[in-house]
Amino acid sequence: MLERKPLFPNVIELNYQAGTVFGCNVYLIYDEGEWVLIDIGYEEVVDEVVDMIRNLDFPFSKCQALIATHADVDHIQGLALLKQAIKAPVAAHPLAATPLREADKLKTFAQIEAQGIDLPLPPVEVEKLIDDGDKIAIGGIELEVWLTPGHTDSQLSFRLGDLLFSGDNIYRDGCVGAIDAHHGSDLNAFISSLRRIRASDVKWLLPSHGPIFRKDEEMLDKTISRLENYRHMADFGTCATDWSLMDEWEREVAEGKLPT
C-alpha cells in the first residue's frame, strides 16, 4: 500500500501523489470510505492511475462518480477506459454529455486538422448530469457544483469549503484556458466566471493544469482586464464582440478622409 499524501484534508492530487507530472491534474476527494475522481487525462495514464488508486486503498466499489470538468480531450480521452476499470458512473454538465457520447473530435479538440492532430476518442455515456448549484455527496462532505463557462460552454468548477477545483478557468501565472470559438469559448461568459471566482470567499484554487495556488485578487483583476480588452480585438475572431478599428474605418470612408 502507498502512503497517502493529501494536499488538504480529504484531497489527493495524483500527479503530486506520484511525484511526477503525467498529465492534467487528477483530484481524488474522499470521506468516510467514499470517493470521487475529477478528470483523468489521456488514455496512456489510465493504468497508472488505476493502480495508484488501488494501492492507496480506495475500493473501486466506493467510487461515487468519475467527474469531467468539461469535455476537452486532454481531460477525458481516458474516461471510457477508466469507467471500464472502476465501474462507476460518469458525471458532467449536460453540454458535455453529447460530445462525450458522440465522441465529437472537433468539439473536444481531439482533432485539429491544421496542426496534424487526430487523437482516438472512445465514446462514453454520462449517467449523472450536473449543473450549477447541485451537490455531490462524498461520505459526510459535499462538493458544490459551479457552472463557470468561458473556456468551454460546459466548464464546471467544484467548491469544497474554502477550496475551488477551478478547471481551466485560471492558472497561477494569470493565464486562462484556451479561447477558441469552435469548442464553445465565450469571452463575456469567461469574464463573468472569473468575476464570480474573484468575488467568492474561496482561499485556494486547484486548477486542472499546473500548481495549486492561493486566490490572488490582484492577479484575477489583471486577467479580467486583459479578457475585457480581448473582446474588442480582431485577434480573437468570432469570440470578440466588436472591433473598434472597423468603426473608425467606416467613419473615415464616409468622411472621405485620406491616409496621413
Regions found by a protein language model. Name each.
Residues 7, 85-86, 201:
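Short, structured coil segments at secondary-structure junctions
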Residues 23, 99-103, 174-175:
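Short, charged, surface-exposed secondary-structure boundary motifs
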Residues 35, 42-44, 135, 142-222, ...:
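Metallo-beta-lactamase
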Residues 42-47, 54-135, 225, 229-232:
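Active-site HxH/HxHxD metal-binding segment of metal-dependent hydrolases
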Residues 236-260:
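C-terminal regulatory/interaction regions
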